[in-house]
Amino acid sequence: MSIRVAIAGARGKMGAEAVHTVMKHDKMELVAVLDYKEVGKTLADLDMFPASYTVPIFTEMHDLVEATSPDVLVDLTNPHSVYNHTKEALNLNVRPVIGTTGFTDAQLEELSTIAKEKELGCIIAPNFAIGAILMMKFAKEAAKYLPDVEIIEMHHDHKLDAPSGTAVKTAQLIQEARTQKTQGHPEEKETIEGARGGDFDGMRIHSVRLPGLVAHQQVLFGGDGQLLTIRHDSLNRNSFMSGIAFCVEEVMKMDQLVYGLENII
């Protein structure tokens, strides 16, 4: 029996790739798309999709769920919309798979409570690329031995949040593995504000936004006479699709919220 999938954010680059992925998947059926703009009745009305993509488009979550009964909502929208989408989906008994970042700790706690009460799976993944998940795991392990760390994340210039969810998640994992410490000279002074990057538990996070980039991150570990660099590059958005498909299948087996793909693989 196919998993019934709805997608929010289908007109974005990631969302469009996800549409093609679900349409081609033999264990999934794309039953609806959520789009706040009235862009057409079906995906076939949009120039970016083939005429055979007759999947209906809805502007309201409630109408979408009532008409198409999806099992899973894949959200690839933006930080302004994702919290409301996730909360509404859970309250309508739809399992969210979220690839959008920008949640506050309070929002994550509330969503986790709802998912637990309803015994529904929910996956919030700052990054769907398997290689990026391995990078985070390796970084956590390295921090046990090399606690002086800086993170440089680089993304396309249309990304709204900084630092990226992947960088924040990496820093949180490193925080679990090392004792908090202040890095750099104790009397260092920024002659340009922000030059040393954002401070997270003593480690510095630097965000780069440039055209031509997709999603890239390096974690630098310094030690006496040595530098260890762990780096991951997503060269195109296909790198995320296997992770999305994996999460759609996995969320059907779950009864609570999981934050981070590294907690599943």
Swiss-Prot record:
A GO biological process held by the record: diaminopimelate biosynthetic process
Name the record gives this protein: 4-hydroxy-tetrahydrodipicolinate reductase
Pathway(s) per entry: Amino-acid biosynthesis; L-lysine biosynthesis via DAP pathway; (S)-tetrahydrodipicolinate from L-aspartate: step 4/4
Binding-site list for NAD(+): 9-14, 99-101, 125-128
Keyword NADP: yes
Primary subcellular site in the record, as a coarse category: cytoplasm
Function summary: Catalyzes the conversion of 4-hydroxy-tetrahydrodipicolinate (HTPA) to tetrahydrodipicolinate.
Family: Belongs to the DapB family.
Localization: Cytoplasm
GO molecular function: 4-hydroxy-tetrahydrodipicolinate reductase; NAD binding; NADP binding; oxidoreductase activity, acting on CH or CH2 groups, NAD or NADP as acceptor
One cellular component (GO) term of this entry: cytosol
Active site: 155, 159
Gene3D superfamilies: Dihydrodipicolinate Reductase, domain 2 (3.30.360.10), NAD(P)-binding Rossmann-like Domain (3.40.50.720)
Gene name in the database record: dapB
Organism encoding this protein: Lysinibacillus sphaericus (strain C3-41)
Residues the entry annotates as binding (S)-2,3,4,5-tetrahydrodipicolinate: 156, 165-166
SUPFAM superfamilies to which the protein is assigned, alphabetical: Glyceraldehyde-3-phosphate dehydrogenase-like, C-terminal domain, NAD(P)-binding Rossmann-fold domains
